[in-house]
């Protein structure tokens, strides 16, 4: 078994899909450009949630190539409507910007990774169901026992699997980012827990580092 982490570049979707088909557990994270589009959207919505059309259009246009093979782009349309509804709700209840950002980016990672899994014809798993942190204010406070138990229990019979990467849950169920290298960390955790033959960690400049599993 090989465990890989991928940066989801929209212009490389076909290549990523092809690599997810062969005895591979793939961890997907978003490209920085898409993260930046969400930061703009969230900051603009805080100022005036009625004036975010341009930001919504930018995100939709960016994601459209990933969903063009789905009937009527339904998953993307549903996700865009979800974003609008969530922002209205979160802003009304004064949810902290950091929590809004983590939650929406985790949801986007989930939607994109699920699309990749469907295009590849393999199973999908929400990475937030695997990695557990003790404290939302300390991303290094991993609950290793719970995390490794989750991975071994939920992935043990999966030879082909796509996982949304970079986000975790606290013991209280709160969603949080585990940092820019979160998908690589998750790939390493999965690889070690599953005794993978090889772990491949992809970085933004497209260099690939192959790390033997422990």
Language-model regions: role of each:
Residues 1-214:
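Nucleotide/pyrophosphate-binding catalytic subdomain
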């Amino acid at each position: 078994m090989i465990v890989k982490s991928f940066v989801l570049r929209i212009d490389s979707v076909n290549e990523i899909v092809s690599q997810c088909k062969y005895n591979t557990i793939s961890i997907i994270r978003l490209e920085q450009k898409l993260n930046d589009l969400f930061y703009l959207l969230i900051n603009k919505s805080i100022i005036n949630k009625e004036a975010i059309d341009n930001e919504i259009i930018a995100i939709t246009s960016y994601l459209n190539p990933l969903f063009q093979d789905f009937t009527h782009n339904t998953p993307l349309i549903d996700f865009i409507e979800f974003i609008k509804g969530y922002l209205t709700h979160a802003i009304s209840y004064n949810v902290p910007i950091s929590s809004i950002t983590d939650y929406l980016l985790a949801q986007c990672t989930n939607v994109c990774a699920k699309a990749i899994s469907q295009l590849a014809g393999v199973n999908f798993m929400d990475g937030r169901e695997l990695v557990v942190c003790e404290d939302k204010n300390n991303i290094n406070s991993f609950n290793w026992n719970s995390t490794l138990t989750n991975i071994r229990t939920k992935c043990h019979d999966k030879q082909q699997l796509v996982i949304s990467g970079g986000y975790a849950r606290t013991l209280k169920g709160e969603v949080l980012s585990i940092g820019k290298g979160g998908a690589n960390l998750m790939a390493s955790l999965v690889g070690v827990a599953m005794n993978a033959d090889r772990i491949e960690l992809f970085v933004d400049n497209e260099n690939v580092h192959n790390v033997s599993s422990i």
